[in-house]
A protein has these predicted regions:
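Flexible "arm" and connector segments at domain edges
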Residues: 1-40, 44-115
Length: 115
């Protein structure tokens, strides 16, 4: 199951990246933009499917990561950017505590192929 889920994510990510390239080449084309949101939705769907298959609380994790990302802001509530545009961690940054999103399982529950 592990391999299949990872393959699905990889496949959908590739389709999303292709749609993104096509959309950014012609951003005013409504068909390209529609394809982009469809492929992005498919990618998110298979990520949620993966989380469900392994009993991971992705909704809660997303909320915690969002809160953590918002803690990256500086004292004035503004993002701090690296030269390439990536947002840096500000003085109030708090990493997300995701342990509550991961159920305790015995590692031998899955064989070496993740099944």
């Amino acid at each position: 199951m592990w391999d299949m889920q990872c393959d699905l994510i990889e496949e959908e990510a590739a389709e999303f990246l292709e749609a993104a390239d096509e959309c950014f080449a012609d951003p005013e084309n409504i068909d390209r933009r529609t394809d982009l949101i469809k492929e992005l939705s498919d990618l998110v769907f298979v990520c949620y499917q993966f989380a469900a298959a392994f009993n991971l609380d992705l909704d809660k994790a997303m909320s915690l990561v969002f809160e953590s990302n918002m803690s990256k802001l500086d004292e004035q509530g503004k993002p701090i950017f690296r030269p390439d545009g990536k947002v840096l961690k500000g003085p109030n940054y708090q990493p997300p505590d995701l342990m509550s999103c991961v159920p305790a399982v015995h590692l031998n529950h899955y064989d070496t192929n993740g099944k």
